Amino acid sequence: MKIVLANPRGFCAGVDRAISIVERALELYKAPIYVRHEVVHNRFVVEGLKQRGAIFVEELSEVPDDNIVIFSAHGVSQAVRTEAKERALTVFDATCPLVTKVHMEVARASKKSIEVVLIGHAGHPEVEGTMGQYASEAGGMYLVETPEDVEKLIVQDPNNLHYVSQTTLSVDETADVIDELRRVFPKIQGPRKDDICYATQNRQDAVRDMAGQVDVMIVVGSKNSSNSNRLRELSEKLGTTSYLIDCPEELKEEWLTNQAKVGVTAGASAPEELVNQIIEQVKVFGGTTVDELKGREENMFFEVPKELQIKTVS
């Protein structure tokens, strides 16, 4: 049984930056370091940071006074930022710069009282943070997930409307929703460039290229990872039986029985170390050669905050 590796896969620049922020904060300021929400949606990563002294909380009320808190890669609402400022907490912001770009689009629309439609999944922390950028009482912000949601959407002024999207969605599904928005609201405006992040796009393109070449697809990622779920869904949509797993122990031998080729890819928050562990488990179940496909080269890099670039605390 041949193992085919997707390329690109795994960590993106935003995830790399977020994890580095937590690691450097622990190195410079020592444990405990509080992190609001999982810094990235990967159990392997989160457990590793916990062992080094990171404490993950869901609300700032769980952070004691005079402590450091890190905002996760998914971003936070303006209300959370205000609360942290009022409590004089030391904040390091690990929000992905591509999420921040969407936040800025919403904030600009809010200042002009332009209504905003967000394409995204209800309850996802990125969606909650993005919705929390809108402050205009004269306008409004609305969440849609499907073309059917658009059909039911009622806005105040169809001629003064803007849309943005969650960065980790399926490219195809988002395109369907945008098409419906433009049909129902012909004058709606959108971002100059698609909000779907480069890494989400590239990993989905890699799955498209690989799905027809393999008999079964293993996606490495956590169940709460939006972009990992979209990879599994896309592969299934393309006709390849696919599974999302968080660790080698979740891989089942029967999935691979009588299969000639197994594809392996990873969501943007899954580390290569975990991918390698799962490849080794595939080999235990009969995997032989590993063939890595060619893919789009990624050179994106995001700096950590200046305060964390120094080697010692003055």
UniProtKB/Swiss-Prot annotation:
Alphabetical keyword list: 4Fe-4S, Iron, Iron-sulfur, Isoprene biosynthesis, Metal-binding, Oxidoreductase
Top-level enzyme category: oxidoreductase
Disulfide pairings: none
Reaction(s) catalysed by this chain's protein: isopentenyl diphosphate + 2 oxidized [2Fe-2S]-[ferredoxin] + H2O = (2E)-4-hydroxy-3-methylbut-2-enyl diphosphate + 2 reduced [2Fe-2S]-[ferredoxin] + 2 H(+); dimethylallyl diphosphate + 2 oxidized [2Fe-2S]-[ferredoxin] + H2O = (2E)-4-hydroxy-3-methylbut-2-enyl diphosphate + 2 reduced [2Fe-2S]-[ferredoxin] + 2 H(+)
Residues annotated to bind [4Fe-4S] cluster: 12, 96, 197
Keyword Iron-sulfur annotated: yes
Lineage top rank: taxon: Bacteria
Binding site for dimethylallyl diphosphate: 41, 74, 124, 225-227, 269
Pathway: Isoprenoid biosynthesis; dimethylallyl diphosphate biosynthesis; dimethylallyl diphosphate from (2E)-4-hydroxy-3-methylbutenyl diphosphate: step 1/1; Isoprenoid biosynthesis; isopentenyl diphosphate biosynthesis via DXP pathway; isopentenyl diphosphate from 1-deoxy-D-xylulose 5-phosphate: step 6/6
Example GO BP: dimethylallyl diphosphate biosynthetic process
Oxidoreductase among keywords: yes
Binding site for (2E)-4-hydroxy-3-methylbut-2-enyl diphosphate: 41, 74, 124, 167, 225-227, 269
Residues reported to bind isopentenyl diphosphate: 41, 74, 124, 225-227, 269
Family label: Belongs to the IspH family.
Function: Catalyzes the conversion of 1-hydroxy-2-methyl-2-(E)-butenyl 4-diphosphate (HMBPP) into a mixture of isopentenyl diphosphate (IPP) and dimethylallyl diphosphate (DMAPP). Acts in the terminal step of the DOXP/MEP pathway for isoprenoid precursor biosynthesis.
Annotated protein name in UniProt: 4-hydroxy-3-methylbut-2-enyl diphosphate reductase
